[in-house]
């Protein structure tokens, strides 16, 4: 077992090893990410990249720095040898970094959220005109510290696992040529993506189930249980796996409290918030003019389909509709982050619509997702949900996403586009 560093010499050994690791990484085939354009390396603000573990945050920052030709130093605090580093030692870290790297204009601090006193340290660096890049895997810890100590001095970028377009780039799949063979290759790639998910390292590991199981366990124990001092860990983990198994699902905290023997619905609500802050789950609020409804009737999704199908004892592997809906949300949250839009779901007694996309108070698109609409009842139900959404919102941009169907149709005076999900996700690439 590696020991926590206690001297500058030991710190230098750790940082030299980390430097060698990043040098080796620079030789690997990397995928361009859309989020690279959102990182402003010339800004006086700290650039903060947050997202689920293993989504490629560090790689994105390395790519951005290297592509821009910046001189930078790097320290990864997600290293057990640096677990004891606190406020008093952060200046020692900076001193050793200058020794290891020489002069540098940018400082990349990876997974810094658990280091005591880091916001004050970063604030001092910014006052000294150092350009700082941060990554972290917990939205609350980063955001609360930033709000307290770095108000107006940080810019946040959210990163998610690979989109289907990025997956195709890494697999060298042609996403544009409209020939029979190229379309078939894209179709096959999407089937694989829908099963394996978008975590970058999953493309290179043989045992995907073991990888994802370990990833989820790591997030639950290190990013949540240890940080929030959760006592009943078995019950908490059972709740987390249940929500991943049944996602997408509308959260009813009172029912979950009874099922998992928690003392109150408030405890369940807190636990679900922790899961969202660690980016295991993504919440979608109900479309309503009433704030109370939006705040209480939330629908949760796994942040990536790998968390649904690739874990040991996963339940959702064969539920194709759930997987497709989750893939659509994964694409929507990326797109909406870029556009500054919000996503809701609509549910009433007379029907449902999976996604209502809003720009401020204006609804820009209503989207329904169904794996297969060949059955008359299924097709009618999905179209009725879209028509209900159109009536409630006044939106005329209506989209029905399926696994393979392509059609433009009129229904009750409105035009509905029916598209395969894999084609739709590539439109923005």
Regions found by a protein language model. Name each.
Residues 73-103:
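Short glycine-rich substrate-engagement loop in P-loop NTPases that contacts/grips substrate
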Residues 58:
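Walker A/P-loop
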Residues 2-3, 204-363:
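Accessory nucleic acid-recognition modules appended to NTPase machines
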Residues 24-41:
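Pre-Walker A adenine-sensing motif
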Residues 403-429:
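Domain-level recognition of nuclease-like catalytic cores that cleave nucleotide substrates
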Residues 2-22, 145-250, 276:
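Interdomain motor-coupling "hinge/lid" segment immediately C-terminal to the ATP-binding subdomain
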Residues 131-137, 158:
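Structural recognition of the conserved hydrophobic beta-strand(s) that form the central parallel beta-sheet
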Residues 49:
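Hydrophobic anchor at the beta1->P-loop junction of P-loop NTPases
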């Amino acid at each position: 077992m590696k020991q926590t560093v206690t001297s500058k010499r030991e710190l230098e050994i750790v940082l030299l090893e980390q430097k060698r690791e990043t040098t080796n990484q620079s030789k690997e085939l990397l995928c361009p990410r859309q989020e690279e354009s959102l990182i402003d390396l010339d800004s006086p603000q700290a650039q903060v990249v947050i997202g689920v573990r293993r989504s490629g945050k560090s790689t994105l920052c390395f790519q951005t720095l290297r592509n821009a030709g910046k001189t930078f130093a790097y320290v990864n605090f997600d290293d057990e040898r640096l677990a004891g580093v606190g406020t008093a030692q952060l200046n020692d870290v900076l001193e050793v970094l200058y020794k290891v790297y020489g002069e540098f204009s940018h400082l990349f601090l990876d997974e810094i959220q658990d280091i005591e006193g880091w916001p004050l340290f970063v604030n001092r660096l910014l006052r000294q005109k150092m350009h700082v890049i941060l990554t972290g895997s917990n939205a609350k810890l980063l955001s609360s510290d930033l709000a307290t100590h770095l108000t107006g001095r940080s810019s946040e970028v959210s990163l998610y696992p690979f989109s289907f377009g990025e997956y195709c780039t890494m697999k060298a799949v042609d996403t544009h040529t409209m020939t029979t063979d190229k379309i078939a290759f894209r179709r096959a790639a999407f089937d694989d993506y829908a099963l394996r998910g978008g975590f970058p390292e999953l493309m290179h590991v043989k045992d995907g189930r073991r990888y994802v199981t370990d990833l989820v366990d790591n997030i639950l124990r290190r990013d949540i249980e240890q940080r929030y001092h959760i006592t009943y860990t078995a019950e908490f983990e059972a709740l987390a796996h249940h929500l991943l198994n049944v996602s997408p699902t509308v959260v009813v905290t009172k029912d979950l409290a009874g099922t998992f023997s928690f003392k109150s619905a408030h405890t369940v609500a807190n636990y679900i918030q922790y899961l969202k802050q660690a980016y295991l789950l993504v919440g979608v609020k109900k479309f309503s003019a009433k704030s109370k409804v939006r705040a209480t009737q939330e629908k949760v999704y796994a942040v990536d389909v790998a968390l649904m199908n690739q874990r040991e004892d996963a339940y959702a592997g064969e539920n194709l509709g759930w997987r497709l809906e989750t893939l659509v949300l994964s694409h929507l949250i990326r797109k909406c982050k870029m556009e500054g839009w919000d996503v809701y779901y609509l549910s009433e007694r007379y029907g449902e619509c999976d996604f209502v996309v809003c720009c401020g108070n204006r609804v820009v698109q209503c989207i329904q997702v169904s794996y297969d609409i060949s059955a008359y009842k299924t097709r009618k139900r999905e179209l009725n949900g879209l028509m209900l959404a159109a009536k409630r919102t006044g939106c005329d941009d209506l989209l029905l996403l399926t696994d393979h169907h392509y059609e433009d149709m009129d229904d009750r005076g409105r035009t509905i586009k029916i598209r395969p999900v894999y084609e739709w996700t590539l439109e923005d690439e």
